[in-house]
Amino acid sequence: MQKNLFTSESVGRGHPDKICDQISDSILDAVLKIDPNSRCAIEVMASNRLIIIGGEITTQGYVDLVSKSWEILISLGYTENDFTIISNVNEQSKEIANQVDRQDDNIGAGDQGIMFGFASDETKSFMPLAISIAHDLVKRAEKLRVENKINGLKSDMKSQVTIDYSDQKNPKIDTILMSLQHDKDVLLDNFRNDVKKLIIEPVVNDYNLNSNYKCFINPNGSFSIGGPIGDTGLTGRKIIVDTYGGAAHHGGGAFSGKDYTKVDRSAAYMARYIAKNLVAAKVAKKLEIQLSYGIGMIEPISINVNSFGTSKFSDLEITDFIRNNFSLSPKSIIEKLNLKNTKYFPTSFFGHFGRDDLDLPWEKLDQVDKIKKFFK
């Protein structure tokens, strides 16, 4: 019988793209700490033994960008002999600043774009099942790496989880794949056994799902050369890992390195916040919200809702509720989600959504009662 399969992946902190995301967001946090009104758009490239920091920063303070980069790299097991770091950062374009820096309710979007928010009742965090398991696998692996619980485990790693939805009410794990960097002298059979017993099995047990899944650990054999030395990394190259694992649309804009005035980030967070509260209020079992903005414009150009046939209310009814009950101007989003005071670095790995381990404002369920009263 043909199976109904869906797959999502996640990556660890030492993945080259994620190293770049972490450097970008650590710089963002440092800049906002000294000047909460700073503007920041940091892009990092890591290739072989060279790391380049580019982008724009406008701030009243000073941050040593190279030192911030080393903090991340050293935490991942590298030394100052491993890389050369070059910084080439400019100020924000004055034409963009003219739209963003207005000090009243007329703050406009810093760019055009489309953003999506999504929620599903599949998991307690209102995230799709496949990406939730994939994140938990690399999260546990990183914890064991830091604690030195698995011999030779290093920080570059990937997970991939395939869910069988042939029975929609009882999804099953079909396949789990993990590739994890390790020291050269590691015995691969022992390493694979440790990964299965100490990482994969405990995570699967947490979900109370089937144990008869296919499992592949380092299927290509040895994986001793990793991180930027093995592959080039760039900020913003893991946007599906950062969001919903492919279970929802993505507008294309990355998050890391961008301050709260960038609607690529702030509006995507707001769309998630609204979708999660609506699903938690049982308005729908699954919900996707699209927002679109134009540069310099205060309100979104469009709001679109897709409940995938899981709601007794029409998508237009839900759209009208959003339009009439949530202020979606950039200024209102910043204030509602307290984005000036949020620490962004912790979101730069293991996903920006469904993070029960973090106290993120866009994950709060503080609109549920209000929504339930409206949708009686």
UniProtKB/Swiss-Prot annotation:
Region called Flexible loop, residue ranges: 92-102
Keywords per UniProt: ATP-binding, Cytoplasm, Magnesium, Metal-binding, Nucleotide-binding, One-carbon metabolism, Potassium, Transferase
Cofactor: Mg(2+); K(+)
Pathway note: Amino-acid biosynthesis; S-adenosyl-L-methionine biosynthesis; S-adenosyl-L-methionine from L-methionine: step 1/1
Oligomeric form and interacting partners: Homotetramer; dimer of dimers.
Gene3D superfamilies: 3.30.300.10
Protein name in the entry: S-adenosylmethionine synthase
Highest taxon, organism lineage: Bacteria
Originating organism: Mycoplasmopsis pulmonis (strain UAB CTIP) (Mycoplasma pulmonis)
HAMAP family: S_AdoMet_synth1
Job of this protein: Catalyzes the formation of S-adenosylmethionine (AdoMet) from methionine and ATP. The overall synthetic reaction is composed of two sequential steps, AdoMet formation and the subsequent tripolyphosphate hydrolysis which occurs prior to release of AdoMet from the enzyme.
Amino-acid positions noted as binding Mg(2+) in the UniProt annotation, renumbered to this chain: 17
Gene behind this protein: metK
A Gene Ontology term for the protein's cellular component: cytoplasm
